[in-house]
Amino acid sequence: MEFTKALIKGKLIKRYKRFFADVKIGKEIVTAHCPNTGSMKGLLDEGNMVYVSKNDDPKRKLKYTLEIIKVKKNLVGVNTHFANKIAFHGLVNNLVKEVANNDSIKAEVFFDKETRFDFLVEKNKQKIFVEVKNVTLFREEKTAEFPDAVTTRGSKHLKTLIEAVKKGYKSYLLFLVQIEGVDNFKIAKDIDKEYYENYLLAKKAGVNFLAYQCKINSKEIKIDKKIKIINA
């Protein structure tokens, strides 16, 4: 996924009220939209280098959007709205090898009245649901983690993926790791024990789990390589 314009470098002052971030660009402090309502645990230290996009649409109240934060020499993509675009680009361009060379890809497909999954992929007459989770947490130097806060919605998705397997679908949960410099991924069971337990149940039931790391720079973010999931 390419940015429409090259990003602008700045320094993070603070994030507040979930949706706002003050950023210093040169000698000016601007307020940017923060497109990530999660905890952003470990990313928000004052002085962290950031990259923002700029939109000159006069109808927009905030011209800048926070896109990338640099933490411990690692670039981290924080715009959750881009996760599905990055995943779609990966699916279309056969970057996710487990579902490469597919016949069709549909986005936002309902499984039942209450739940829709990010993608329905068809390959060799097999229907495959793919649910995407954006990953930005890394507390250990080389290991990405999910979730960064308790996620009841995430647990619900795991349970529904189990139901999809029971009905004959193949199911994948793709952890999209928007963090450079990590080699492994694991479930943060100390943050959300229930999610970890549901992960184990889903794995046992036949849900497939994948972790793919992204390549990140000020011009684009795209899926780069598969990394190892190290949970039991």
Curated annotation (Swiss-Prot):
Superkingdom classification of source: Bacteria
GO molecular function: DNA binding
Coiled coil start-end: none
Stretch forming the signal peptide: none
PANTHER family tied to this protein: SUGAR FERMENTATION STIMULATION PROTEIN A
Similarity annotation: Belongs to the SfsA family.
Protein name listed in UniProt: Sugar fermentation stimulation protein homolog
Taxonomic lineage: Bacteria, Pseudomonadati, Pseudomonadota, Alphaproteobacteria, Candidatus Pelagibacterales
